[in-house]
Amino acid sequence: MRPLGSALSPATLMVLVLLLVPACGQDYPPAVLSEPQLQSLARSVKALQKGEPLPELEKIPSIQSVYLAWYDSGRRIGHSWQSGAGVAVAMEQAAAGSRHGKEADHAELSLAYGFRPLDPAHLGDDLSPVHRGVRGVEIAHGGVVVRFAPSQMIADNLSFERALTRAAAQLGIDGDTLLVEARLATFDALQVVIDLRAEPIATQLFRGNHTLPDTAVTGTAVEQFATDMAGWMQRNLHENGRMTYLYYPTSDRESDSNNMIRQWMASLCLTRMGVASGDEQMLASARLNIRHNLDQFYSLESGLGIIEYRGKVKLGAVALAALAILEHPDRARFAAQFNALVAMTDHLWRENGSFQTFYRPAERSANPNLHNFYPGETLLLWATMLEREDDAAREARFMQSFRYYREWHLAQRKPSFIPWHTQAYYLRWQKTGSEELRDWIFEMNDWLLTMQTHSRLAYDDTRGRFYDPAPERAHFGPPHASSTGVYLEGLIDAYQLALAEADKQRARAYRESIRAGLRSAMQLQLRNDETLWFAPNRERAVGGLRTTVYNNVIRVDNVQHTLMGVMKMLEFTSEREQQLLSAGADKEALLPLN
C-alpha cells in the first residue's frame, strides 16, 4: 500500500526507517528515549536536511513507521510517512541528498509502533478525545493508506472525527463507506521535535507538550504563570480596545464568533490586573476596553441598560458589564451606563428570588441550564455593590435569591453553578458572618471536589482538571480550561473561609484541590519553547491557555478566569503570610506553594 500525501522524497524517511525499524517480534520501544538516542536523531535529521551522509544512529527497537514533517517559522512546508519497504532504493536516494526541508527551522518526528485494528463499533471508546495527541490513526482503503500521527493531530488541532472525515475525502469515499469498507487501526508513537536552527536539539514530548509534575506548582512558578497570562491578555488587546475572543495558534487567525459574557469578564480581568499592579497604563487599557465594548454593544431602552449581541440580551452579560465598570477606579466616567445596567438586573429579578435570564428573546429564559450561570454572576455584582454601600432592599433581594437558588441547585446539581455563588456569598459572609452563607459555601464546594477525584483519565497530563467521566455526569459537560479557572476562583474563597473558621480538614482538602487545579492549568499554558513548533505567530500564542491538553485553541476566558483566580490566590497568600509572620503563627495556615 502507498501512503497518501507524501510531500517529501521517500529517501528522507526510508533511511530513518532502515535504522529504526527492527526485526519483527521485538518488544515495544522505551517510553522515554535516552539522551544518546535523542542526540542521534537530531544529528540524523540535520544530515538529511543538508543532504549529508548519515551518522551512525542509535537503535530504537520496535518502530514500525516514521512520520517526518518540516516546519519553517511555525508553518509546515513538507511531510511524509514511510514504512520499511524499498529500503535499498531509499538509501540510494538519501545518499544523493534530500531536496526537502532546506528552509526548515524545526522538524517533527513521530516514531510509530503498536499498530492494532479498530472496531468501527467501538470507535467512541478507542478514539475518545482523551487519546487525541497520544494515539495516531491509520485508514486503509483500495490499496491506499492515510495516517495521522499523534503530534500531527496536535499541531493541526485535529480531532479524530475530523481526521476520519479528512481521510475519507483523500480516499474519495464518504464517511459511511469508510466505516464499512476501510481498515482502521490505531497506534502509539514516540514524539520528538528537533530544533534545527543551530546545533540540532531533539526534545521528546508527550502529546506535543511536557507533562508537569506536582512539584512544578511552586510560588515562583505560579507567579510566572500569572505574568505570562497577563502578557497574553495585554498582547491580545487591540489598539481600538477590542479584546481577542478566540484564537487559533495553528493558523494564526481569530474566530469571527463572540460572546458578551466572556468579553465583559475579560474587561473585569483587565481592571483587576491594573488595580493589582498599580499600573496606570494597564488601567487605561482596561478603560479603553470598557469604552469599546460600550460603544459596540450597549444601548438604553426605557431606562434599562442593554448589552446586545446578535439580538440576544443576557442577564449575565448585563451584570458582568456593570461589575467591570464598578471595579474600575474611573467608574464615574461610566456612571450613567452603570446605573442603567443595574436597573436591568433589578428589572429581571422576580419576587420568589429567581431571575429572568434573557431579556431578549425572553423565551430563552425557559432554558433551566442558564440558571447555573447568570443569576450567580448577578449576585456577585450585587454582593460587590453591597460591600461598598449598604442597601437594605437589595440585601433582602440578595438573600431571597440565595435561598431560592440553594433549593434550586440541590434539585439539579451542576458544578458550573458553584463558583459564581461561592464568590458572591463569600463577599457577603465577610461582612455579615452569616452561618447560612458559610454552611452553603462549604456544602457546594465539598461536592465540587468530587469532580476532580477521577481527573486522571488514562494519562498524567489530565490530572487536576474538574471533569468526571462517569456516564451519570456526562451532562455536566466536557473538560475545559475556563471551567478549571472559574472553579479556582471560587475555591480560593472557600479555602479562605475554611481558614477563617479554623476548619483545618476542609482547608487541607480545598488547598490540595487548588494545587491540583493549578497544575492542570499550568499544563495548558503555551510557552515560547519547542512545544510551539507549529505556531507561526508565537507572540500571540505565548502565555495563553489551551482549551484542553488535546485542543490548542485559546479562548479569552481560558486565560481570564485562571488569571483572576491566581491573582486572588497570590494576593491572599501574600497578605496572609505577612499576618502570620507578624503574629508568629504557624505557616501551616498558608497555601504552601514552595
Where are these regions (language model features)?
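Low-complexity, Ser/Thr/Pro/Gly-enriched N-terminal "stalk/linker" regions
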Residues: 198-261, 280, 285-288, 292, ...
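Solenoidal tandem-repeat scaffolds enriched in leucines and small polar residues
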Residues: 344-403, 407
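Carbohydrate-binding/catalytic loop surfaces
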Residues: 243-259, 302-323, 355-377, 419-434, ...
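Extended, well-ordered alpha-helical scaffold segments
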Residues: 218-233, 278-296, 330-348, 389-408, ...
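Well-ordered alpha-helical scaffold segments within catalytic/enzyme domains
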Residues: 208-219, 264-280, 319-333, 377-391, ...
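Basic nucleic-acid-binding interfaces
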Residues: 27-199
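Bacterial N-terminal signal peptides
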Residues: 10-22
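CBM-like carbohydrate-recognition segments
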Residues: 258, 452-490, 494-594
